[in-house]
Amino acid sequence: MGENPAKSHYAQLNLGEENEMEIFGYKTQCCRKALCIAGYILSCGALLLLFYWKPEWDVWANCVPCSLEEADVVLLRTTDEFRIYSRKNVTWISVSGIIKSRLDYPSFAEEDSIFSKALMKPSLQVKSIQVQKIRYVWNIYAKQFQKVGALEDHHTCSAIHTKFGSGLTCSEQSLRRVICGPNTIDVPVIPIWKLLIKEVLNPFYVFQLFSVCLWFAEDYMEYAAAIIIMSPLSISLTVYDLRQQSVKLQRLVESHNSIMVTGRNKEGFQELESHHLVPGDMVVLKEGKALLPCDAILISGQCIVNESMLTGESIPVTKTQLPQADNLKPWKMHCAEDYKKHVLFCGTEVIQTKGDDRGVVKAVVLQTGFNTAKGDLVRSILYPKPMNFRLYRDALRFLMCLIAFAAIGMIYTVCVFALNGEEAGEVVKKALDVITIAVPPALPAALTTGIIYTQRRLKKKGIFCISPQRINMCGQLNLICFDKTGTLTEDGLDLWGLLPSEGNCFQDVRRFPADHSLPWGPAFRAMVVCHSLIVLEGKIQGDPLDVKMFEATNWVIDDSSGHQIEGQRSTHATVIRPGPKANTASVDGITILHQFPFSSALQRMSVIAQETGGEKQAFTKGAPEMVATLCRAETVPSNFESKLLFYTAQGFRVIGLAYKSLQSGKQSTDLTREEVESDLTFLGLLIMENRLKRETKPVLEELSAAHIRSVMVTGDNIQTAVTVAKNAGMISPTNRVILVEANKIPGSFSASVTWKPLKENKTEDDGNLDSGSQTGRRIRLAAEPGQFHFAMSGKSYQVVAQYFSHLLPKLLLNATVFARMSPSQKSSLVEEFQKLDYFVGMCGDGANDCGALKVAHAGISLSEQEASVASPFTSRTPSIACVPELIREGRAALVTSFCMFKYMALYSTIQYLGVLLLYWQLNSFGNYQFLFQDLAITTVIGMTMSFTEAYPKLVPYRPPSQLVSPPLLLSVILNILFSLGMQILGFLMVQKQPWYSKTDIHSACLSVNNHVENSSSASSLGLHGVGGGDPTEVDNGYKSYENTTVWLLSTINCLIIALVFSKGKPFRQPIYTNYVFIMVLVGQLGVCLFLVFADIDDLYSKMDLVCTPTTWRISMVMMLAVTLAVSFLVEEAIIENRALWLWLKKTFQYHSKSHYKRLQRVLEQDSAWPPLNETFSLDAVTVSVEEDMEGHSNPTFDSNEDAL
């Protein structure tokens, strides 16, 4: 049913956000509701169950479309490819108990606030809905639902200081408390009965209930009883697991809801519990450690916080107060990407506070409850984003095909039994029975079996996963983005030297640690104070770069409070003093008065410091090219660029230093960043060694050999990044590096892009960080169609993405190095790679890479935390060796899923074909025969087939990602035909045997006791004869020569396909390494052969088998042996023959439809690509890329179709 697109009926919720939804208004109609209730009763609840599964049908049946303003029910639909519906009832919040009269409106809410705009007058009610724990209220004026529980974004910096700096009034607090709800992240432990009902109503168990009822009606007591025993056990285990998760999550958040805070309103300070806080409240942060109960904007003072809960990194982060800017920009726009530097996030720990001039640290509550950072984390756990992996979609489609297959069998069954004069009730039972045989309800669940065991193996290797459904995706990864510092290179940098500048000329380089005699001066003072280090439990903590720089000075941090600073009141400040090993200095200490923390967007940090009895000075440290632009031109050496290139080309990490003296009279906290970071004096370059981790080269070599492309995404200098890429083996020494520079033309809406070869700088031996001769054999980049690599900065990437978007895919195809990238640019880059149909992995340290780690198909955070919200995967070992490990396990899990899927599909089909054959003679399998096949064979195989571990070597192609690929479909179809052929052959041949008799089932074996009959099994089927209608016939129940033959052949055939489908190399270990599985198969085969050759009357009677001559038993074994040989030969010689499929693709000129592959073929024909030493302006560029490159297909051998 389509939706009315009328504006009043339809709107968008959370536009542009990750959880964007469409919302439709509906009004309940009494007559429709009455008809639905009647339908529930008449259908015995089946209609109600259907509406439970499909909430949109429930709304469409019970309600009529209306405007959102009139709606009492809303229907929500996600805007992703899944289009998932959910139903929510509209509720009303009454505030009449707070607002007594119309005259009180102004004192409760400002006119421009959502609280005023949502209040319906004169009823004094607010219309609201709650979606995924977030409350939305109806904005009467904007005619839309808006989120509450957060401070409005339109406030300016100055407005936040003036409006909320002294707190809200009691009446404002009361109104906001009622509308926003309590500041709690309330995750109640779900009662067991609720979990039980939810699990029982799962379609899988509903189908099982239907099957059990049908089996009881047909007297299939044993199998039905087995299912009744197994299902509650399975449900109980699932409910227990869900309950444990619920308890664990509740423990994670319970401390959040019981924190005491000091708040302030217009009447003064007050102690209150954190759940009373509302957006706009002002809280005072006291000294000492504390957990934050909400997101808050720091408006005075400074805080050191531990954000490991958010990023996985335990490095302390400095938060500074929001500037009091006098412009009309909203505060987030004014602060741009740096707004987080002023925000204290819920769930993080305040380690240390530093008061302002009045000794107070104040913050304004920004967001409460589930709107906070911690609330967002909890919601992501409660409502995980579904993954669009075609394997699961194909599984459901295949299930639909099996249902259609079963429908054919039902028609056949009805015809056979009806033509033989069976009762209508019996015909219906038999027809329905076909569905329970042909359609295994566990088929989609079979795809997850490999994931469960893989997750356990990963945990043993120190790789933790909070999103198991992404494990299969790891098997498809063909491009990995790596952060540089701390990921490819060592986290702890070594200080190599200082290149001081004086009088706009560089002086001699001062090496570390050989040269300890650093002279006292501005450059030395910059190294002493320009950092964000703190002393925590007696140890200096902070950024590793800052730690190395500071330790080289031999000064110490005296981090105590109450230092008297000339011209100011007593304040909490950090004082740096000379240590015992420090050189003689002319001052007793330097006090850090204020700090502007490092910003990835600005590429620098600054501090304001004051020597004891001296003047205030500002010191800046950051990217050299950025720092140089902030300095007076006459202080920057003329050979600045060549010197910078000299060191960065060797792989050094280079930091620029600058300073200036500040005029007295203005308080440090009143100075803006722009005032401080201007007209600086350039001090020199700090040179740090950026050594590769020992695992980097072997891992990148392994990925390259597997044709998995590696890309570097870093915040460092482009020359340093290119050098590290060369040393690591990402770029071969014989390949060209082309620098892409894009610039926006000032004062216009146009831009230009230039391609030029990157300058090579031959360096002296003593400066080489990592000589090329030491790298051994170089690695050829896996995915490069040409012998060149693009390198670009974050600024150029942004300009290309904005002005030359049609060129971006062509650049990304060969881009290997991205330098000076901000966190948002990293996320954008990953998304752009995904648009080219790459399966993208991202490996970083979890701090500045958070966004990219979440966006990537597989984000891997290198962190000491067991699990980080920064990414789906966390490696406790800080090494990229986890990347190939994860890919190996992902490939193994993916192949296991395919093996299980094929086995489940074939097992049900074999049983289905056997039953239909016997239906021709109005016969079927016996209860214990079904029981043996389903439990003793299939269940045990399903549990042990997934034990096979990953193959240790990564091969240069990926496993298939879709079930509808030609090799897999051919494998399934051929094996179905082999099984069908063998069963029909056995069925017909047994009837041609001289000892065969329809009526005398003991004629073949004279040694059997005279005509022992199983009266109990005979009565259980309730059939009358075998088509001939001979009145002298004896009813033998299920027992017949056809039954014995078909059942034995089909049972052992299940073992054959289990062995044939259990893939080993190249993605999993050989099958013989799975000892448990091999023992199971051998044991099951032994039991089956025993049933074939045994002559035990009681056993045969129980299993509804009849005795046959030994020659016929040997004939059955020979048929099975031929089937095994043919199946194995076809699987190995055709299905798994990679060379054959590549030849077929080449013969029929099949090409991958993946966007990047199509683009490669286009560029291979373009002799003018890449352009060198050319500049394109915006209006001069023509589009040469195919316009219709949409869609995604990743057939079986898509990853490297031309290489092999």
Curated annotation (Swiss-Prot):
InterPro entries in the record: ATPase_P-typ_cation-transptr_N (IPR004014), ATPase_P-typ_cyto_dom_N (IPR023299), ATPase_P-typ_P_site (IPR018303), ATPase_P-typ_TM_dom_sf (IPR023298), ATPase_P-typ_transduc_dom_A_sf (IPR008250), HAD-like_sf (IPR036412), HAD_sf (IPR023214), P-type_TPase_V (IPR006544)
Segments in the Cytoplasmic topological domain: 1-32, 243-397, 455-897, 951-967, 1065-1075, 1135-1204
Record topological domains on the Extracellular side: 54-219, 419-433, 919-929, 989-1043, 1097-1113
Entry membrane topology: Multi-pass membrane protein
Keyword presence, Disulfide bond: no
Keywords: ATP-binding, Magnesium, Membrane, Metal-binding, Nucleotide-binding, Phosphoprotein, Translocase, Transmembrane, Transmembrane helix
EC number: 7.2.2.-
Localisation: Membrane
Residues the record lists as binding Mg(2+): D845, D849
Main enzyme class: translocase
GO biological process: intracellular calcium ion homeostasis; polyamine transmembrane transport
UniProt entry tagged with the keyword Nucleotide-binding: yes
Xref: PROSITE patterns: ATPASE_E1_E2 (PS00154)
Stated family: Belongs to the cation transport ATPase (P-type) (TC 3.A.3) family. Type V subfamily.
Protein name, per record: Probable cation-transporting ATPase 13A4
Native species: Gallus gallus (Chicken)
